A protein has these predicted regions:
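Extracellular and organelle-lumenal recognition/adhesion modules and their flexible linkers in secreted
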Residues: 1-204
Length: 204
């Protein structure tokens, strides 16, 4: 709470990060095609565990293979480097979806496959980029450093990335760290929080 009268309490449902490595982009769970990563970059909130994702050819990408179905949400924190665009991609054997995001202003560009997209501004030029797709036979989640809207043709350039998450459902929850296996965060519980007299459709 920000003071005695205003503020908010975030209570989240149970959720599982299906990404086996959420922030170790150098590990083998992250397959790299014409890209490389370097560690210990300055990240969200002044952290020092962000990564520089660089491409060495057109259509360079990094991806994690995860088999799932139904509504799934892929999110990653991204900041511009020498390139000012990123493309997020959810690959399915039946119907894939992607979106381009402008890292100068957080606005979305070209999308395909009718995804639901949200971009959340963070501190120091970072954005949490979120894409949701409801489809069958999802098999991998990709990040492309992009040269411009609808353009990954350049042969060099970089962006910063941090804190990837894949979760079942139609929206992103707060970040759940993983290291080698999926991790579940239990639902939040608020005890002694009052009654219907305090929290109802008109107040609270």
């Amino acid at each position: 709470f920000s003071d005695s009268t205003n503020g908010a309490l975030l209570l989240e449902p149970q959720s599982t990060n299906l990404a086996l490595q959420s922030n170790q982009f150098n590990e083998s769970e992250w397959s790299k095609t014409n890209t490389s990563v370097s560690a210990n970059e300055t990240g969200v909130g002044g952290s020092t565990n962000a990564w520089l994702l660089s491409k060495s050819s057109s259509d360079g990408l990094i991806r994690q293979f995860i088999t799932t179905t139904g509504a799934n949400t892929f999110s990653v924190y991204v900041k511009k480097g020498s390139l000012s665009w990123v493309r997020l991609f959810i690959a399915s054997s039946t119907e894939s979806s992607s979106v381009y995001v402008n890292l100068d202003n957080g606005l979305t560009g070209t999308s395909s496959g009718s995804p639901t997209v949200k971009v959340v501004p963070m501190d120091n030029g970072w954005y949490r980029c979120i894409i949701t797709k409801d489809t069958t036979n999802i098999n991998n989640f990709r990040i492309y450093p992009a040269d411009a809207d609808n353009d990954t043709s350049g042969t060099s350039g970089n962006i910063y990335i941090q804190y990837a998450q894949v979760e079942a459902g139609s929206y992103a929850t707060s970040y759940i760290p993983t290291s080698g296996s999926t991790t579940t965060r239990l639902a939040d519980v608020c005890n002694n929080s009052g009654s219907a007299q305090d929290f109802n459709s008109e107040e609270g």
